[in-house]
Amino acid sequence: MIGPMSEESSTRVPVTYEHCAHIEGPFYHGTKSTIEVGAEVVPGYGSNFQAGRVSNNIYFTALVDTAAWGAELATALAGNGARGRIYVVEPLGPFEDDPNVTNKRFPGNVTQSYRTRHPLRVVGEVDGWEGHDPDVVKGMLDSLALLREQGLDVIED
């Protein structure tokens, strides 16, 4: 079986630390940071999405588009005007569905987003990835700002 759906039953198989081997890459990590191929991305650094918060997990995805959101939002929230980076990564330990997006607006994990408390090894970089329209990114940033104002910008970490 490849991917988060079981071919026999068409029901989603949740991805947990104990049950993640059925998910195959490639995997991507979108970020504002410049990282060398061969380096390991580890948890324990500041969150890109909440100032002053240390992230206990590293987040990654099986979709370039989802990684693009990570890269674009991280750079926009940093306010540095730079273009984000998308890296091809391999998890060095077990991982699980990202509970911040799984079964939220849509059933399942449509963004194919995962998180781990273990390192991710950078094995390459995605060059020439297509970003989202600036107005769409602004809309997402405005939505995040509204959630923050309402105290609803909760990150399950």
Task: Write out the residue ranges for each language-model feature.
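Short, polar loop/linker segments at the starts of domains and inter-domain junctions
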Residues: V37-F49
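Short polar catalytic/cofactor-binding loops
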Residues: G30-V37
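Conserved NAD+-utilizing ADP-ribose enzyme module
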Residues: I2-G25, K32, N48-I58, V64-D157
